[in-house]
Amino acid sequence: MPIDRMPSRRSVLKLGAASAALAAPFIRTARAAEPLGFATWSATVDQVKAHLAAFEKKTGIATAYSNSPFAQYRETMITKFTGGAPVDMLWVSDAWLPEFAQAGWIEPIDRFKQLTAYDAVTSDFCNASTMFEGKQYGLTYYTDYMGFLYNAEILAKAGFTTPPTTWEEVTAQAAAIKAKGLLDYPVVIGMAQESWMIEFISTLVFSHGGRLVDDAGDTVMQEAKTEAALQWLVDAVQKHKVLSPGCVQTGELEVLKTASAGRAAFVLLPKYRLRALNDPQQSQVAGQFKQAMMPMGANGAHATVGWMRFYAMTPHALATAERGENTAKLMEWFGGKADGDYRFQKTILKDLALGFGIKALYDDPDVRRDLNSYGDADLMARQQDLAHKKDTIAPWFGEWSDTNGTAWQQALLGKVTPAQALKTSAAKWSDLKRAG
């Protein structure tokens, strides 16, 4: 899922201080006997309810479950926090971590060693995505990464028996497909100003060996490896004409629809979309799409971007030691093992193709059977090992993203050079970081 817009740091901190003051009396009076409040957005609802029922039966601990649509979820939770609502555990997007942590709406879980023990068996980018200022704030709910998917039948018609391994080879194969009249625009990448745009951009940058922001939060997006990523994209549109200039109006869902209709040879899409592409009820080209390792740039690797959503704990959960331990049990039941098995992770994979952070699940017979029914479990695991968290997660992301997206689009349309576009983006990031 995409990164989400956030307010400025100043507004977050002001609201966080206010919410802490308002909620404090309620938190102090919370009792361990009260049901544990668990809030989510409206996804996997039936699966959550069934797993909660099993938890209550197993532990005797009562829970109170609520959910709201994703589009309103963040605002709904802020209202709950400022009103002192009895929420103990909730889903949080990796994009919101700085905001929620700085505001004091969620608490680190480092004290619960039974929870942090799962770090050793979890994908590195998932662990990194729950860390803020040296503290860990949760366990993985689900995760995924941007995959490089290709139509094997179209490649075969063009005379290719293997997919490209570099972005240069992507260009060459796409040009051959175009020359044979198989497709006008064999490459389909969404570069519309929508929430998925940062995932597409990050994937191209990481696979070229670049970054947008360094570990200190300073911009490096103006450097050569990042420029090489944008230059490849610009050349695909302007020079080789294998990617439509209409990509600036193409969102992630349109990429999926185009691929499903057989009008794409190479696409960037979230890995979980592979199941839909190979489902005869959803796709005209079922059985034709495969996943390959992300192509790499001249100075890059087969890297991609990953994202995750996690279970977090609130100050309300820590009102008493017993309540904290009970909330930790609930978090482990969902984000770790339940009765000795990763039951919830396997359920949402089977039912909804939602990915997992536990690396050992790629060796689970049931999981492998499911993944291999529409893809390649071993390749999926190898690619996940090379996924990196987004490096642009910051309270000012939303303000920067508009400028960055426009700059990349202007470069794609030939209005500015890649270097000029990245200089504009870098300057905006630096200005926002200084302003805080």
What are these model-derived regions, one by one?
Residues 54-124, 131, 156-165, 259-266, ...:
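Extracytoplasmic "Venus flytrap"/periplasmic binding protein-like
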Residues 43-62, 404:
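Short, polar/charged alpha-helical segment
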Residues 174-175, 216-247:
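Glycine-centered hinge/linker elements that transmit conformational signals in sensory
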Residues 272-284, 298-403, 434:
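C-terminal lobe and pocket-closing loops
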Residues 94-146, 169-171, 197-200, 286-292, ...:
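Hinge/lid segment of periplasmic solute-binding proteins
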Residues 80, 85-88, 116-155, 185, ...:
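A structural signal for short loop-to-beta-strand junctions that line the ligand-binding cleft
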Residues 1-11, 18-21, 25:
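N-terminal secretory signal peptides
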